[in-house]
Amino acid sequence: MTALLVIIYLSFAGLGLPNSVLGSIWPQMQLDLGAKVSLVGYLSMTVTAGTVVSSVLADRIVRRFGVAKVTVVSALMTGCALLGFALSPGVPGLFLCALPMGLAAGVTDVALNNFVALHYEAKHMSWLHCFWGIGASVGPVIVAASLRAGGSWRMGCGLISAVEGALCVLLVCTISLWNRASGSAGSLQGSAPAARAASIFRRKGAMPLLCGFALYNAMEATAGLWGATFVHDSFGISTSDAALTSTLYFGALTVGRIAAGFAASRRSDRQLIRTGMAVSALGMLLTWLAGSAWLAMGGIFLIGLGFAPMYPAMLHATPSYFGAELSQQVMGVEMAFAYVGSTCFPPLFGALAAPLGTSIYPGFLLACLLLAAAAIELADRLFSAREFCGKGEKQII
């Protein structure tokens, strides 16, 4: 299944490719379309709304059509949405394209994560999310290159749309690999959902685990969005120097996930999560107590490094908590909670920072980490305490 694994990695890079494009093109897009600066927030919320809806419905969709077809159609939808952005004459067209972009992202995210969790070792889950980070990093580079070449944001969107189109063609040409893998490992395609989505919430340990997903993604998004502002406001360095904070943070996430992939063969999911919590807590304390901008940036680097193994390990543990039959459905709900956390908490921090100042940044993150640790540990104890319903599966977290 090595060839298929490469396709999955490329698909996840394609999933990350448009993720940071909106922020990259918005300064020029806003001027060209005469839109309000704040409109980008509503566009982002539209994408997120589509992602949450399709995450919850992903189990039914994938069971009906299979992972391969879902991934192909999602790549096609993403490419068409980006092309729509490039050709849009005004703001209404942007909103029409934002929704299908979100719908495509959510179902693909669930389908690929569940496929890897069921069929591959834990290290591949970490590397999968590393490729998402690579895709998210390449998107703005493509936009910047098109702008430097004298093009516009429309050209940047068109180029990324072409990349998604090429990925779609590649997926169509390799669809037989997916069919063979699903057949050999046992496919859920064509089967009915194992349980109603609402029943997941009644399972012992489910709610603490879902809260852990929301809180983790709240931390990751808040740390990335507000880190540079915190360093700039606290130490008075230039905006160009402060911008390095974001590079260090996201670089740490990417490098950390590569390293976590190698560590996953020797460490359980539980150990990876706890190690990540400890390293990120150390980074938060260093950021809080730092006497210089560079120490604070080093602390934020450690925060990203600590976060790196946590989310992939939490997702990889889902089949061992709920069983292969339920894992895809549960993963959809987990990701819906994750998206809600990453959408709501950065604005919440902004609302608190307005009267209190961005100096609350490390304390805010540490409070979220303590709550996330409590929720995840409680879930682990509750799942470990009851007899597991899966057959032939051992607990790996």
Indicate where each model-derived feature is located:
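Extracytoplasmic gate region of multi-pass secondary transporters
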Residues: 22-23, 204-247, 251-254
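Interfacial helix-cap and linker-helix signal at transmembrane-aqueous boundaries
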Residues: 29-30, 61-62, 142-151, 231-232, ...
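Helix-breaking motifs and short loop linkers at transmembrane-helix boundaries and internal kinks
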Residues: 34, 66, 87-92, 236, ...
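Conserved MFS/SLC helix-loop-helix module at the cytosolic interface between two early adjacent transmembrane helices
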Residues: 53-92
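Cytoplasmic helix-loop-helix junction between adjacent transmembrane helices
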Residues: 97-131
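Helix-loop-helix hairpin linking two adjacent transmembrane segments in secondary transporters
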Residues: 128-179
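A late C-terminal transmembrane helix in Major Facilitator Superfamily
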Residues: 321-358
